């Protein structure tokens, strides 16, 4: 009996993985279309999100691991509805932000602003948050304030 249950679990996991691959492909298509229709010129990160530095400060001080930085983060659904607009102190490397934001911060200096087009798997994933639905593709503006 145990052996049969293990096979069922394996097939359930495989089905879930296949579904997530399909959903990731669909998210990539939506994000690519957004980027192609926007006037901003984006680059694609190895993890699958798109980014564009829209304000470059004169500072050359990159953000260091453990450094506390003042952030302004605006998160919208990719189709335009603003979900969140917050300012707070973030400790670089604390792990509380999704991949698309933390990887973008590593490319920024104090005073910079970056636009991010994030498919769900680089944003808040399959679980979402209290205000962001699971599998949400997002447009994010992050500013490291001075």
Where do the PLM segments sit?
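Cross-family detector of peptidyl-prolyl cis-trans isomerase
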Residues: 1-146
């Amino acid at each position: 009996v145990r052996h049969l249950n293990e096979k069922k679990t394996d097939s359930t996991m495989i089905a879930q993985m296949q579904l997530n691959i399909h959903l990731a492909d669909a998210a990539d298509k939506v994000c690519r279309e957004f980027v192609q229709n926007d006037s901003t010129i984006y680059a694609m990160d190895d993890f699958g999100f798109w980014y564009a530095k829209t304000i470059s400060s004169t500072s050359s001080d990159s953000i260091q691991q453990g450094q506390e930085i003042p952030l302004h983060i605006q998160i919208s659904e990719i189709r335009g509805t603003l979900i969140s607009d917050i300012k707070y102190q973030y400790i670089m490397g604390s792990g509380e932000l999704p991949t698309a934001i933390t990887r973008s911060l590593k490319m920024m200096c104090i005073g910079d602003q970056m636009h991010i087009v994030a498919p769900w798997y680089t944003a808040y994933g399959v679980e979402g948050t209290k205000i962001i639905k699971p599998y949400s593709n997002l447009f994010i503006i992050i500013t490291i304030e001075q």
